[in-house]
Each structure stands twice: as C-alpha cells, then as structure tokens.
C-alpha cells in the first residue's frame, strides 16, 4: 500500500468525524463521539506509523476500513465487544495456557487487532 492510500484513509476518517451525528441526537453526545473518533484515529495511525512491511500495512488498513464500516452501520464509533471462546479464560499453566492464548488470539476480530490486550 502506498503512502497516498494511507493518507487518503486517514482523511476519510477525519471527514467522517467532522460530519458525525450521534444516534441519540444530543449535541453533547455528538461532540464526545466526534472527539473520540478523531483521537482514536490519531492514536492508531501514529502507533502504526513506523510499520514498513506491506502486509502489515494492508492488515492495518483493512482493520481501519472494517471499523469505519461497522461504525457507520451501527452509528456507534466505539469498538464492538468481543467474547472469549470457550476455555479461553481458564487459569492453566504450560501447554494448556499456550493453547488458551492461541484461542484468544484467533478469536480477536480484524477490527480490533490494534487494541491492546486487557
């Protein structure tokens, strides 16, 4: 992906933030959500600024596009909750722990790949 494509995507997010209207139509909620969209975009684009691998850049752009589409569809700028797979939170050690960590990583949707683990 080229720098122009990434910058175009960033500008698209900022345009969406400028024209965003909260689902509740309350001006305070609209302002809060606009600020969230702008801040989240700024944070994630800066966090991924040093990535040079074309595949990683492509994955980040796909994540951004997925979050845009989900946000516009549901009229909610915040990430959707995800649920852990069965046996994804048990307190095991060794091989079972690694299997659980692998399950959690596989269950993470594309639109949340940049989010920190909690």
Swiss-Prot record:
- Tell me where on the tree of life, at the top rank, the source sits: Eukaryota
What Pfam family is a match for this entry?
A: Complex1_LYR
Q: Which InterPro entries match?
A: Complex1_LYR_dom, Complex1_LYR_LYRM1, LYRM1
Q: Where is this region: Disordered?
A: 91-118
Compositional bias ranges of the Basic residues kind: 93-107
The text of the family note is: Belongs to the complex I LYR family.
Q: What is this protein called?
A: LYR motif containing protein 1
Q: Its encoding gene is what?
A: lyrm1
């Amino acid at each position: 992906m080229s720098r122009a494509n990434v910058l175009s995507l960033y500008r698209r997010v900022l345009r969406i933030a400028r024209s965003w209207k909260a689902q509740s139509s309350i001006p305070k909620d609209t302002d809060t959500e606009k600020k969230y969209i702008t801040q989240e975009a700024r944070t994630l684009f800066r966090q991924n600024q040093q990535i040079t691998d074309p595949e990683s850049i492509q994955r980040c752009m796909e994540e951004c596009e997925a979050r845009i589409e989900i946000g516009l569809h549901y009229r909610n700028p915040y990430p959707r909750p995800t649920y852990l797979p069965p046996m994804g939170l048990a307190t095991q050690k060794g091989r079972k722990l690694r299997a659980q960590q692998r399950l959690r990583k596989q269950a993470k949707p594309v639109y949340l790949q940049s989010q920190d683990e909690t």
